[in-house]
Amino acid sequence: MVGAFKNLLTDPGEWHPSMDGLDFNRIDGEEAARLEEAFTKEDVFSALSDMNGDKAPGPDGFSLSFWQFSWEFVKVEVMGFFKEFHEHGRFVKSLNSIFLVLIPKKGGAEDLRDFKPISLVGGLYKLLAKVLANRLKKVVGKVVFSTQNTFVEGRQILNAALIANEAIDSMLKRNESGVLCKLDIEKAYDHLN
């Protein structure tokens, strides 16, 4: 079992694409400064309130509903953690410890490929990730190309399918030949590369 997931999650050391010659969009200085501002109680509590508290607890034993329910009691310590992270850019190593659990993708799963690994992460780590994601949401649409249709708020993966459909229809109407390439990305989000 370890070998199967080791192969899945290990970099084979093969060729990697180069980013030379790519022209990236940039954010301005004011937006960059806002990304680096100190965390406020409002930022943290808003992110915490938006999170689903019904998820399984992580290695720390606390679910998000604990942090939501106990906010008034724990906010000083939580904000101390955020202040420390902001000032030093790091946290204790154990904070992002996970429990890896295998969940069957279908009934009667026997082969390891029939299982999906789920990471149970601690609540503070999830909260930090959410606060950082909320900040990035404000600028990500400016730096991610408009042709990227997923993972950016307001854009839909269905737009890519619609554009592909229109391109094929246009080629057929003009009686042009072409090549259609469909990529199987079944494991795209399970890989570290």
Where are these predicted regions, by residue range?
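Conserved catalytic palm subdomain of right-hand nucleotidyl-transferase polymerases, strongest
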Residues: 55-62, 94, 111-120, 161-193
